């Protein structure tokens, strides 16, 4: 897990300078809720006459209904019940019933069904027959099992033969299909319940019909199976669909389950397990279970990271062939993945994760969860005073703890570029002066010397570096112990990891580029600033700071955030606590995002034809919408929003100024503006002649500071995009263009070769996507040193090759090698060994030259953003499988957990293949 005590505050168009932390170092542990309720249905006592008249309605009650029951069963059962007489309770009636007419058989079947789960009538009953109605079904099942066993029989097969004969009795005058349907309806309900509940249940454990079990599989997002609470159960992908009944069940039911398995029976068993929810209610079989969608292959060891996914899949498939009765895990995963691609489950719409927003989150009306429990957030430790004084005009100055804390924030930034920026210093002084007060002796920031505090800070930093490994381990364990309970939430009975559970510490805002608020003080967030969202039945998290309380506690299950507070720099924005990127909700949201982008592929032709047609539209608004849509499609521009005066002056498509676009004849446009996060966007592109003409018309008669699209704003553009396709936004265009570019380039450029060469092909494709999305970064300070170091190593290897060639010539002539450059005598090698060594050294040189070129090409390109947010991970996984590239060469540990849902994709997956409309 992360060792940094702070979480990076995320602010649009700005950041606070803290580095991103890896929040997913600890494997996910999913545990089922052990407090399952095993409820026993107790029928109310009624007399025999009333039972015969109420058989149809009794069988249709939800707790007793089998998923295999025909829709017409209630009607047919009530019709038959009107013709029947009460069944005799004697033991002889059980034996004679198999020799009577079909009508007699109907009566015996109804008598069986009236007694509960299709159990046989007991041999003898007491006079007070209604007294057994007060007993639990499980007790009556045990009693009947004992009584049936005591029946006179020449062998133990007597009861078995009776049950088989009863199940084979068919009413006359019915078609084959109807006979088969009736036989399925008359199957003992206990066998159906056993087939359903035996999955994942120990055979020595009594079966509870309404045992609550979360639908989400307890599968670690890194692909490892966690430990489960309570009794161990079978692995979900390896469970047989049919199993022998529990030892506590009646032996009369055994023949039904011991009959040879038929294809129909297997399908029914699968249907039962797939269409029952945690309470035994029927679900729509057409909707895939989200638990199985994110299932990852279980690894038996940690040492196979170097093995390509395709090879691991082959190994799994060969192992699965050993058992014909157990369905293949890989096939089940693949089928569920294909189902998801065709009809994604709309489980969650909120795709924001640890981001700021200008509006309070509102749900879409759909319930995202049933139960939610967590422990709130963890606050940074209170400030500890160090007592080091700053100098004002050469004299030491005493400061209060609050004043000293802010002064220290400024002093530690002495070696950064912000320290000398006028805007940064101005904003800092304005906020610090308020804490100093009007009568304080410090009157000017320029007369202050923060060197003493900076030197103290560097000493503390050096002291931490000198700590032993044991001391660092103790500190890390203590930090983990304090944070452990805040890392996890329980969502619908499943333990999920929380993403940003730390409240950001106070500090000085930095921002990106020339942000107008850089240097302003970010005040300390307190519990009274935070709103908690939690389940109604869950205990409210205890406030960690004594004497304080939460601002508000909500129970809104239509949203996915756990807590939020106002941003201390931009009060109009809010910061949220969400589940981690590897959680089931976030994974489902990512999957829906990429499926929506794939859906755009089916509409892109008509959309492009529509906006091309409107390039000549007489309506200026429609013409501007058409040109803006063209730019968003071709250049992957963001839509853009109006900015306040105190916000960074960044630009999107709708907010372009006349001065941001230059027309270069005959049909080129040069764009130059500040994009998101104040990153400069400079690009010269060739456009359609009609677009070039329209841009010139939009610029006519305007100054450089006027809006280029004066008749258009973001709301109008978004409304138009949603008319073209449901849910279409500028971000969907960016996701589509990024993913399809990656897919096409990987398919076109990949050639046979070793893994490093294929990785370079992937990085080049990733670079093209990053350029399209304008994902840039500043050149690293260590870039020059790294390249120089590689160049020195390459030169050393070339000198080695020269020496090896000399030794090779001498070896061929039978001479001993010369002395080495270090003055030592070399080994006397054969010419073959020397040639092999030369080839190996040449390979090292080629690899280093390739690495050096890659570093040079990627020095200003940020590959991570597009990989995390815009490129469909299934493209990468499928490519790795097709070309035997270990996925660990492309995705780091955090991305492997985030994209666990994509790991079972088919190797032939293509992003541009057709999807459902």
UniProtKB/Swiss-Prot annotation:
Major location category of this protein: nucleus
Domain Topo IB-type catalytic stretches: 582-912
The keyword Phosphoprotein is assigned to this record: yes
Superkingdom of origin organism: Eukaryota
Keywords: Coiled coil, DNA-binding, Isomerase, Nucleus, Phosphoprotein, Topoisomerase
Sites of Phosphoserine modification: 301
GO biological process: DNA topological change
Comp. bias regions, Low complexity: 66-82, 316-338
Coiled coil: 779-858
Record-level GO cellular component terms: chromosome; nucleus
Biased composition (Basic and acidic residues): 102-116, 134-149, 177-187, 256-265, 296-307
The keyword Nucleus appears for this protein: yes
Biased composition (Polar residues): 32-63, 89-100, 150-170, 189-205
Region entry Interaction with DNA, spans: 575-576, 638-643, 729-731
Substrates-to-products reaction catalysed: ATP-independent breakage of single-stranded DNA, followed by passage and rejoining
Gene3D superfamilies, alphabetized: 1.10.132.10, DNA Topoisomerase I, domain 2, Topoisomerase I, Chain A, domain 3, Yeast DNA topoisomerase - domain 1
Database matches in InterPro entries: DNA_brk_join_enz, DNA_topo_DNA_db_N_dom1, DNA_topo_DNA_db_N_dom2, TopoI, TopoI_C_dom, TopoI_cat_a-hlx-sub_euk, TopoI_cat_a/b-sub_euk, TopoI_cat_euk
Region (Disordered): 1-368
Subcellular location, record wording: Nucleus
Function description: Releases the supercoiling and torsional tension of DNA introduced during the DNA replication and transcription by transiently cleaving and rejoining one strand of the DNA duplex. Introduces a single-strand break via transesterification at a target site in duplex DNA. The scissile phosphodiester is attacked by the catalytic tyrosine of the enzyme, resulting in the formation of a DNA-(3'-phosphotyrosyl)-enzyme intermediate and the expulsion of a 5'-OH DNA strand. The free DNA strand then rotates around the intact phosphodiester bond on the opposing strand, thus removing DNA supercoils.
Protein family per UniProt: Belongs to the type IB topoisomerase family.
Protein name as it appears in the record: DNA topoisomerase 1 beta
